[in-house]
């Protein structure tokens, strides 16, 4: 009887050990499959990006030269691991360049720096009509696919530095244009953007005021503490990911503060226009009002408008309705005051014709 019990006990241990080993292998296989799926998603994004690049040429072929160049920005803000021997290598990223086809030799043209929106996104033909509006007035446009952008594979995606060195990438694109295109007027450079691009506009005009004539920030991400507190907890995962900050805002509040435009409100020294919308379901109006109130608290002079339940929510002045394009016209008029473009729009009808051809 004793031998039987001993045998049963040994069998139980063996089965348990086998089950644990089986569970361990299963977890490894699940992790491997998950990574393969994520890699396929990045491959899909790369294909979509190549198609969209073709669309850029098609949508602007009548008025602009479209180019895409590769630049280098600062190294990652932190090494991927302690044994990364290439941690100090500058990061490579792509940048779009749009130049009016009717530029004249020997003349100077104003430059618009236009960073794209999205925590992980890219400069897509979503902005085609806006770029057409700018080109039609004689602006040169540059748009950086800063670190963290989609369409360039997993490495670029995981190089994200939200509110950090992505701003330097955008500055690199600005400097590239001034250094390499003699047609660009270094005295007439503005930065504009929406949502996350609006955040980058704020960060650059506040931290590097001498590099820009003016700025527009549409529905800009402005305060990470407010944003994380008011959004779904899953949003936090973008920041706590090991390849990004790797800590929550409770663990390192100063790290999140340095990535928030509201922390630099006291530095404003250039003309600025801010737009927000009360029914914005992404960058809530309360977050933008924090930025506006911070600027007011420091007695800064700037322009802003709070739109009341404008159709389109977060994208209210980027969609194609007449209401939306009429609002964009006011943005162009703000830029015109400081940038003196060669061919400013006389009215909203001229602007719509430039963007939509009719």
Where are the language model's segments positioned?
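Hydrophobic h-region of N-terminal signal peptides that target proteins for export
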Residues: 10-18
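Extracellular/periplasmic ectodomains of large secreted or surface enzymes and adhesion receptors
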Residues: 54-87, 97, 336-358
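Active-site-proximal cap/loop segments of hydrolase catalytic domains
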Residues: 75, 146-358
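Cap/lid segment of the alpha/beta-hydrolase catalytic domain
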Residues: 65-93, 98-187, 194, 229
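N-terminal targeting or regulatory segments adjacent to alpha/beta-hydrolase or S9 domains
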Residues: 18-72, 353-358
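Sec-dependent signal peptide recognition
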Residues: 2-7
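Sterically constrained small-residue positions within well-ordered secondary structures
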Residues: 10, 59-62, 86-88, 205, ...
